[in-house]
C-alpha cells in the first residue's frame, strides 16, 4: 500500500486532486474523472471497430442485421407467403372463423407485399430524383368478435408464421398525453423489447391492440369535457396507425425533454385492433329493422323474414361505418383501420373441435403433462362433448375450456404423480356431469387400475 499523501494524485496522468473534479481511490491507486472519460472513449472506439469487422459473421447477422430468415420478414416478392399458405397455417392453429382467416390472410399478404415494393422502389430510385412510382398505403385491421372467439390467437398465429416481432397492448391502460396512465408510445416500446431493441426488425412487426372498443367515446355527440381515456386516446393513436416517426422512451413511462428517445417509423408496422364491441349488434339491428318496428300489415311470412334479417348472430355481417361511429369510434380513427373482420360466436361443435384438433389443443396439452408422469390420459368422446357443452353455457368462448379442464383434472394431477401403479387414466362423461366426483383406487402392483365414480 502506498504511503498516504496529503496531495493525492492520479496514478495515470499525475494530476493532483485540486486539478480534477473527482479522484477515485482504489487499492493503492487513484484515477481521475478525465482518465475515466478517456478510457470510455477508447473502449467505445474499440467496440465500434469490432462490430464493423464482425458484422459479416452469421451470429452478428442474426442479431444485428436481421439477415437470419427466421428473424426477419422476407422482402422479396417471391418469398412472401401467399394468402392460401397463410390461411392453411391458420387452419392448423385456429378452428372455425373461415371468413376472418381469409380476410386476415389477404390483408397480411398485401401489407408485406407493400413493404417489399417499398424496398424495391427505394433501391431503384436511390440515384434518381424521379418519384413518380405509385405509393402504396397501409391497411390496418379491425377484428370484431365476442370474448374467447380467437381474436388474439389469430394475430399471434400470424406473427408466428411470418416470424416477425409481435406485441400485445391493452387499450384500457392508455390515456391522452399529460394524464395519469400509459402514453400510446409505450405500445411501440413493447414491440422494441420483443425485437431486442432492434429498430429495423421492430418496424416489420405486428402490434395487436386489445380491448379497442373500450376507448370508444362515452356518447355519440362530442362532449365539452375531456375524455382522456376514450376519444383522447383515439386522437393520440391516429398518426401512429397512419404512419409517423414516433419518439419512444427506451425505459418506458412519460417522455422527458432531457432523455434520449428511440425513433421508430410506424408506417411499416401492421396494427391489428380487436374488441368485443358489446352492444354493436343492437345498433346494426336498429338500423336494419327500423322500418319493421310496431304493428304492420305484412303477412306472417314477411315478419319471419324480417326477424331473420336482424338475427343478432348475423347482424354484424351488415356492419357499416356509421354503426361504429354511433358506437363511439371517431370517423378519423375508423378510416385508419379500413380492413374489418367479424368473428363468429363459437358453437358447441366448434368448441368440441378446439379441444382436440389444433396443434396445441388442450386435450393434447394435458396428455403431454400426464405423460411426464408415465400416465396415458384418455378422453371418451362423450366427455369431450360434455366439456364443450359446459363451456358453451359459460359464454366466455374458448377460454372456458381450459378453466373446465383445470377443474376436472385438479384432483387427478394432485394424486397421480404419487401413484406408481397407475399407467392409464380415462376422463368419462359421467365425471364431467357429476362435477368431477371421480376417485382413483390404488391397486396392488401389476394389476390394472379402475376408476370409481359416484352415482
Curated annotation (Swiss-Prot):
Ligase listed as a keyword: no
Any Pfam family hit: ClpB_D2-small
UniProt-listed InterPro entries: AAA+_ATPase, ATP-dep_Clp_protease_ClpX, ATPase_AAA_core, Clp_ATPase_C, Clp_protease_ATP-bd_su_ClpX, ClpX_bact, P-loop_NTPase, Znf_CppX_C4
Domain of life, per lineage: Bacteria
UniProt: Zn(2+) binding residues: 10, 13, 32, 35
GO MF assignments: ATP binding; ATP hydrolysis activity; ATP-dependent protein folding chaperone; protein dimerization activity; unfolded protein binding; zinc ion binding
Residues holding ATP: 146-153
Segments for region (Disordered): 52-74
SMART domains per UniProt: AAA (SM00382), ClpB_D2-small (SM01086), zf-C4_ClpX (SM00994)
NCBIfam families with a match to the protein in the record: clpX (TIGR00382), PRK05342.1 (NF003745)
HAMAP family (alphabetical): ClpX
Role description: ATP-dependent specificity component of the Clp protease. It directs the protease to specific substrates. Can perform chaperone functions in the absence of ClpP.
PANTHER family assigned: ATP-DEPENDENT CLP PROTEASE ATP-BINDING SUBUNIT CLPX-LIKE, MITOCHONDRIAL (PTHR48102:SF7), ATP-DEPENDENT CLP PROTEASE ATP-BINDING SUBUNIT CLPX-LIKE, MITOCHONDRIAL-RELATED (PTHR48102)
Self-association state and partner proteins as the record states: Component of the ClpX-ClpP complex. Forms a hexameric ring that, in the presence of ATP, binds to fourteen ClpP subunits assembled into a disk-like structure with a central cavity, resembling the structure of eukaryotic proteasomes.
Protein name: ATP-dependent Clp protease ATP-binding subunit ClpX
Amino acid at each position: 500500500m502506498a504511503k498516504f499523501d496529503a496531495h493525492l494524485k492520479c496514478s495515470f496522468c499525475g494530476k493532483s486532486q485540486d486539478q480534477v473534479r473527482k479522484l477515485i481511490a482504489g487499492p493503492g491507486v487513484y484515477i481521475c474523472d478525465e482518465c475515466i472519460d478517456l478510457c470510455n472513449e477508447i473502449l467505445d472506439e474499440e467496440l465500434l471497430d469490432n462490430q464493423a469487422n464482425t458484422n459479416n459473421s452469421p451470429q452478428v447477422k442474426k442479431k444485428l442485421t436481421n439477415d437470419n430468415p427466421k428473424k426477419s420478414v422476407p422482402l422479396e416478392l417471391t418469398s412472401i407467403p401467399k394468402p392460401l399458405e397463410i390461411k392453411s397455417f391458420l387452419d392448423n392453429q385456429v378452428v372455425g372463423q373461415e371468413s376472418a382467416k381469409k380476410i386476415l390472410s389477404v390483408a397480411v399478404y398485401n401489407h408485406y407485399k407493400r413493404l417489399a415494393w417499398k424496398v424495391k422502389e427505394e433501391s431503384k430510385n436511390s440515384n434518381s430524383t424521379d418519384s413518380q412510382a405509385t405509393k402504396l398505403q397501409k391497411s390496418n385491421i379491425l377484428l370484431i368478435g365476442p370474448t374467447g372467439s380467437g381474436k388474439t390467437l389469430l394475430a399471434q398465429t400470424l406473427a408466428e408464421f411470418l416470424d416477425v416481432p409481435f406485441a400485445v397492448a391493452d387499450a384500457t391502460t392508455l390515456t391522452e398525453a399529460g394524464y395519469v396512465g400509459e402514453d400510446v408510445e409505450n405500445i411501440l416500446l413493447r414491440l422494441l423489447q420483443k425485437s431486442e431493441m432492434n429498430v429495423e426488425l421492430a418496424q416489420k412487426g405486428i402490434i395487436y391492440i386489445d380491448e379497442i372498443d373500450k376507448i370508444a367515446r362515452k356518447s355519440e355527440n362530442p362532449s365539452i369535457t375531456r375524455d382522456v381515456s376514450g376519444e383522447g386516446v383515439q386522437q393520440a393513436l391516429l398518426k401512429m396507425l397512419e404512419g409517423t416517426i414516433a419518439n419512444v422512451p427506451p425505459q418506458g413511462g412519460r417522455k422527458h425533454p432531457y432523455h434520449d428517445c428511440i425513433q421508430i417509423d410506424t408506417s411499416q408496422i401492421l396494427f391489428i385492433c380487436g374488441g368485443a364491441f358489446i352492444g354493436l349488434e343492437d345498433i346494426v339491428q336498429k338500423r336494419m329493422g327500423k322500418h319493421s318496428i310496431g304493428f304492420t300489415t305484412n303477412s306472417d311470412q314477411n315478419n319471419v323474414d324480417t326477424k331473420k334479417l336482424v338475427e343478432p348472430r348475423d347482424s354484424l355481417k351488415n356492419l357499416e361505418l356509421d354503426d361504429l361511429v354511433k358506437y363511439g369510434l371517431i370517423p378519423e380513427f375508423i378510416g385508419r383501420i379500413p380492413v374489418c373482420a367479424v368473428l363468429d360466436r363459437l358453437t358447441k361443435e366448434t368448441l368440441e373441435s378446439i379441444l382436440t384438433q389444433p396443434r396445441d389443443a388442450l386435450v393434447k396439452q394435458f396428455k403431454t403433462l400426464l405423460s411426464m408422469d408415465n400416465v396415458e390420459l384418455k378422453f371418451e368422446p362423450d366427455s369431450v362433448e360434455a366439456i364443450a357443452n359446459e363451456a358453451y353455457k359459460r359464454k366466455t368462448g374458448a377460454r372456458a375450456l381450459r378453466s373446465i379442464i383445470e377443474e376436472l383434472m385438479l384432483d387427478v394431477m394432485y394424486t397421480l404423480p404419487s401413484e406408481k401403479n397407475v399407467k392409464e387414466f380415462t376422463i368419462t362423461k359421467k365425471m364431467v356431469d357429476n362435477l368431477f366426483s371421480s376417485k382413483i383406487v390404488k391397486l396392488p402392483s401389476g394389476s390394472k387400475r379402475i376408476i370409481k365414480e359416484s352415482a
